[in-house]
Regions:
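Acidic/polar low-complexity flexible segments
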Residues: 394-405, 478-506, 533, 542-592
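N-terminal carbohydrate-binding/catalytic regions of secreted carbohydrate-active enzymes
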Residues: 44-148, 320, 324-365
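Loop/turn elements at helix/coil->beta-strand transitions in domains of secreted/extracellular proteins
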Residues: 56-62, 127-132, 159-166, 191-195, ...
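C-terminal outer-membrane/trafficking sorting elements
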Residues: 591-658
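Short, well-ordered beta-strand segments enriched in hydrophobic/aromatic residues
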Residues: 406, 455-465, 536-542
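Aromatic-rich peripheral "rim/lid" segments of glycoside hydrolase catalytic domains that contact
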Residues: 156, 332-408
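Aromatic-lined glycan-binding groove of carbohydrate-active enzymes
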Residues: 48-67, 72-73, 203-317, 327
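N-terminal module-boundary/linker segments of secreted carbohydrate-active enzymes
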Residues: 24-70, 194-196, 203-204, 212-220, ...
Length: 658
């Protein structure tokens, strides 16, 4: 018995030593962020596009994830570049050599690059992904690269950030590979339990369907096992690829049929000529580069996601994030139909099984290629929200004037708080980031707020540490505020009508207006601002940014992004932006005067409440406010200076807004 307790204590102590400490959870509410994608499509939110009334917490979304880059040869051969140079006779690499299908937005990278792993995880958590399933289908397990992903999970856990759970997808040599993975990561390693995606009370492992019964007994006992391969649907099967319309996959383990999983992909294979534009049972015509007129739009992805949203399975497995590479093979007379898209089928022609170009690949990760960019990532975000649901965009509670000569405690009771993750400036990458951004340190933005009164807008921003002092070299990229005042993403620069930024010649902030004719920012009025330690606030007249009315608007803070950038993909990994990527926060300014809102109940907390109509002295109705029936405190309403008449039932009262 003493030995038993000694062993138990050892296990518990070991677990406590190695288990990362969980910080208080930080929730940036990324499902409330808004934007349009590069094609002008609205990313779904509760303001537009999401019809599910509440978030379904039982939904789990997994992403097929790869760490194999650079592990089978470091030379970069890019099919897209080769086709651009000569689409008829490209300068291929050797037979069996891995080729990239295009260039990622963060550049060609090596599996296990900490900067890349961290930014992938941030992007996927923002998208609502719950777990990764690693590709180990060819029996290579990439242990060192998997460890880097685990390290990033631990880092996020220490910061209190959401992180993905993990599972493995096997195929070739499933028996041998599953035993290796079990002994490497699972056996007698309770300190690793927080990594795993659990299904039916055990870690999930996917493998060859028949190998589930022939693999080692320790594997069978430790895992919930599901068969997984392309197009294999049915009982105890979780495929990673299926034809539209995809079916539910189910289990009968308990003697009762339980519907479990469905897959969604962005395309199939170059050899089958089913690409990203395939829908309605056909692939559009491809040109000599193997591209279609609608490669950028994700028709296959949308068709499959609509089926998943309709059927609403408990687990949705997405194919895929970042395969990027495929081996070069050559046809013979027996398989010349496999010839690459856009080329004449013949023996001796090159083909690639899984990845070819922008049209024929299954990746979602943002790309530097002109037809892809971040279109598929934004399509992912939008459809995950439609599938699971999204939270309401938070609304402000009260109007408030901020005195810039006062202290920062004025902001303590201002809501909502717009959160940005801490720690997203921890790593740098000379291959992924612009050189000018790397030369400077970046402020790690974590909190933003907005306040308003009748005439002015006030903005607050906070970083994790003291704000790094601006210099001449980064004056125009230092702690800059972007405003989309009309929420119209078809005008301005990427929708932004105003930029509030320092000038390059002095310690002053100005309002810059986007000039559609010159495609440049025009300097305008100087505004007031103040910073102290890790906080900063600024103010401007509503009229200076076309926000005289009480309306909603979108905004974003950026720091140390490339100077004079006209490339919004720079926001993926250069400097810090809040919120991430091309997303924006939405300030629901209209809610402060909505008749249905309780936002104005701060007027007199002791009185009874009713809807009070407010008129100017010309008889024009200005607003309907919820306030006390005693009509006290009317001067606190969000109105321009002047005299007004408030009416409630047969009561009326003149009051002055100072």
């Amino acid at each position: 018995m003493k030995k038993y307790f000694a062993l138990l204590n050892t296990i518990v102590l070991t677990f406590m030593i190695h288990m990362p400490l969980q910080a208080q959870e930080i929730d940036p509410m990324s499902d409330t962020w808004v934007c349009n994608d590069g094609l002008g499509r609205v990313v779904a939110s509760m303001d537009r596009g999401v019809t599910r009334k509440q978030v379904d917490e039982n939904c789990q979304v997994g992403m097929f994830y790869y760490v194999w880059h650079g592990q089978h040869g470091a030379e970069v051969k890019d099919i897209t570049r080769l086709l651009e140079a000569d689409p008829v006779n490209p300068a291929w690499g050797s037979v069996n050599q891995f080729h990239w299908g295009g260039k990622p937005a963060m550049g060609y990278y090596t599996g296990g690059d900490r900067f890349i792993v961290a930014h992938h995880m941030q992007q996927l958590m923002d998208a609502g992904i719950d777990f990764y399933f690693f590709d180990v289908t060819n029996a290579f397990t990439y242990d060192a690269q998997v460890q880097v992903v685990m390290d990033e999970i631990d880092r996020r856990m220490r910061l209190g950030l959401k992180y993905p759970k993990l599972a493995f997808l096997l195929h070739s040599s499933s028996e041998k590979t599953s035993l290796h993975l079990y002994e490497k990561w699972y056996k007698n390693k309770p300190e690793n339990d927080h990594y795993w995606f659990y299904w039916n009370g055990k870690p999930l492992m996917m493998m060859d369907y028949d190998a589930r019964k022939t693999c080692d007994a320790a594997v069978r006992n430790h895992f919930t096992l599901r068969g997984s391969w392309a197009w294999e649907e049915g009982e105890d099967k979780w495929p990673w690829l299926a034809y539209y319309p995809q079916n539910y996959n189910f289990s009968n383990e308990t003697g009762k049929k339980v519907y479990e999983q469905m897959t969604v992909a962005t395309a199939m294979h170059p050899v089958s000529k089913i690409g990203k534009s395939y829908s309605g049972g056909s692939e559009p015509a491809v040109n000599k580069y193997g591209l279609t007129a609608r490669t950028s739009r994700g028709a296959f992805f949308e068709e499959q996601f609509k089926q998943a949203i309709k059927m609403h399975p408990r687990v949705l497995m997405l194919t895929q994030w970042n395969e990027w590479m495929a081996q070069r093979f050559v046809t013979d007379e027996s398989n010349k139909a496999l010839t690459r898209p856009g080329a004449t089928p013949k023996a001796g022609e090159t083909y690639f099984v899984d990845v070819y170009n922008q049209e024929f690949n299954r990746d979602i990760e943002p790309s530097s290629e002109s037809l892809i960019r971040d279109n598929y990532y934004m399509q992912l975000v939008s459809n995950v929200r439609k599938y699971r649901g999204a939270r309401e965009i938070p609304v402000p509670e009260a109007c408030k004037s901020i005195d810039l000569s006062g202290d920062f405690a004025q902001w303590d009771d201002v809501t909502p708080s717009f959160i940005d993750e801490p720690g997203d400036c921890e790593y740098t990458s000379s291959t992924a980031q612009k050189a000018e951004s790397l030369k400077r340190r970046t402020n790690d933005i974590v909190l933003c707020k907005v306040a308003k009164d009748a005439d002015s807008l006030y903005f607050y921003v906070q970083s994790t540490k003291h704000l790094i002092a601006p210099s001449i070299s980064n004056a125009e990229t230092w702690m800059t505020l972007l405003l989309n005042s009309d929420m119209n993403y078809s005008n301005g620069w990427e929708g932004y009508d105003y930029m509030i930024s320092r000038s390059g010649t002095g310690d002053h902030y100005y309002i810059y207006t986007w000039n559609g004719e010159t495609q440049k920012w025009d300097e305008g009025k100087e505004i007031s601002w103040i910073k102290y330690a890790n906080q900063m606030m600024l103010s401007m007249a509503k009229s200076d940014v076309a926000l005289e009315s009480d309306v909603d608007f979108d905004f974003k803070w950026i720091d140390n992004t490339p100077k004079n950038t006209t490339e919004i993909l720079d926001f993926l990994c250069n400097g810090d932006v809040a919120p991430n990527a091309r997303f924006n926060y939405r300030y629901k300014g209209s809610k402060l005067v909505s008749p249905e809102s309780d936002a104005l109940q701060h007027v007199d907390a002791s009185g009874k409440r009713a809807r009070v109509e407010v008129y100017n002295l010309s008889g024009v109705k200005m607003m309907t406010a919820v306030c006390s029936t005693s009509l006290k405190g009317l001067g606190q309403l969000c109105l321009p200076q002047g005299t007004y008449l408030a009416k409630f039932g047969n009561k009326s009262k003149k009051f002055t807004k100072k």
